[in-house]
Each structure stands twice: as structure tokens, then as C-alpha cells.
Amino acid sequence: METRRNFLKKTAAIAGGVGVMGLGGASLSGCSNSNDPLFKISLAEWSLNKSIFGKSRQLGSEEWAKLLTDDPDALLQGNIKHLDFAKVAHQDFGIDAVEYVNTFFFNKATNKNYLKEMKTIADGEGVKNLLIMCDREGALGDPDEAARTIAVENHYKWVDAAKRLGCHSIRVNAQSEGEYDEQMKLAADGLSRLTEYGTKNDINVIVENHGGLSSNGKWLSGVMDMVNHPHCGTLPDFGNFYLGSWEEKEMNGTIVISA
């Protein structure tokens, strides 16, 4: 049976790619006799989305989005409850750190008692709350300045919730519209403003390559250069980089920079 340790070693070699090969013969095998895990890993709540959403995953996108706004709890039709996520991570998977997704408690960001219960459950399991993945709160790079401001401010409550849960970050999207350079400027503006608020609350703002130009490593690294803030960074998903139309050498370089 494939052990978690061996799986992680193989994953590290694949994900590290150029970096691992560049070590000139160094390998991960030296860690095989250690009782310490090669990496400390966390479980993203989205990994269990089918078990939490259940049949609501079969709804059309418009109906699903309307329910998320009008009655988000009605979407939670699965056999795993959001409040049990930390318990499932620890008891079923042996993982002691979690990454929440805001759509599983979309109307609870300002509910102090609910957030306290989440933290109490996680603490009871010895599980660390790391971050909240934030979606469906507007485009941080919206070309319309008023809409962009609303999107930035919509994320404030998740910064506050992350702080109450003991997280270190929120994960956001660098969504925008327009030409390449213009989107970069707009996304950097929204991220900079949100990062200012996050910094006041000791919460980092990290961006996932999550569709659109954010899946272009060169573009996203350019956005990070524009923001230029120690509390704003990236959360690379190596399955989300689009490689179809760039030179391999160039794209490999930008992925390493973005990561």
C-alpha cells in the first residue's frame, strides 16, 4: 500500500520539478529513515466539497449562485457538516491543519458564536486553522472603481473571521477584465487595498492562480511586483497554470518565480 510519506516524496519531486533536478544528484531518500514527516500538510475543505454540498452540486450555476446569496445553508446537503470538517481532517485523515472555504459558511462570517464554535472544535482536535479561501465576493480587479471598492470591502469580514479563527491568511482571486497590463494594474490596486486592511489585523492576503490571467504565471508575478507588500503573496495551484501558448523555458521560469 502507498504510504502518505512515499506519496509526499513523489509529489514533492513532481511539484518541485526543475528545483529538485537542479540539486545535481541530491535526492529525498535521505529522509526515509526519519520518523518526522517530509512535509506538514493541510487539508483544503474544497477536497470534500461533494460530501458537504451533496445533491446541491447538481444544480445549475445560476440557481446555485442564487441560493448561495439567498439561503446558503440550503446548499449544504451532504453527509459531512461544515462544523465537522476539522474533526474529519484529524480523525479520518490524520491531518492536523485545515484550510476553510467561505462558501461552506457563507452567511456566518460575522457570527461570533459560530466562529467560536468552529475554533473550539478545531482546538479540541488539535487542528490548526490556517486560512479561509474566499470566493463569490466580487472581482478585486473590477474595471469599475465603485464595484472594485465593494469587492475589497466585501472581503473585510473574512479577514475579521480569519483572525477570530486563528488563521494566518485569507486566499483570494485576482479577477479582472480588460487588456493584459490594465488587468494587472486593477488587480494590484484591489489587492493592495485589501492587504492594507489585512495587515492591520495580522492577516496575510494570498492569491491563487485561479482562472483568467491569474493562471498566467508571468502576469501573476507581475501583479505581486506591483503590490510589493510582505503580507501579500501567492498560493500556487500547480494544476491551474495554463501552459498552452507559452514557450516551455519561459513558462517554467515564471512558475518558479510565482511559487
Residue ranges and their predicted role:
Residues E2-R164, E182-K185, S192, T199, ...:
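N-terminal pre-domain/capping segments
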Residues E247-G253, I257:
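Noncatalytic carbohydrate-binding groove/subsite architecture in carbohydrate-active enzymes
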Residues N240:
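Positively charged, amphipathic and often flexible ligand-engagement surfaces
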Residues G198-H231, L243-W246:
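Basic- and aromatic-lined ligand-binding clefts that recognize polyanionic substrates
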Residues A15, N209, D237:
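Short glycine/serine/threonine-biased micro-segments
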Residues A162-E182, N201, I206-S214:
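Active-site groove signature of glycoside hydrolases
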Residues G25, L59-G60, G222-M224, M251-G253:
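Glycine-rich, phosphate-binding/catalytic loops in enzymes
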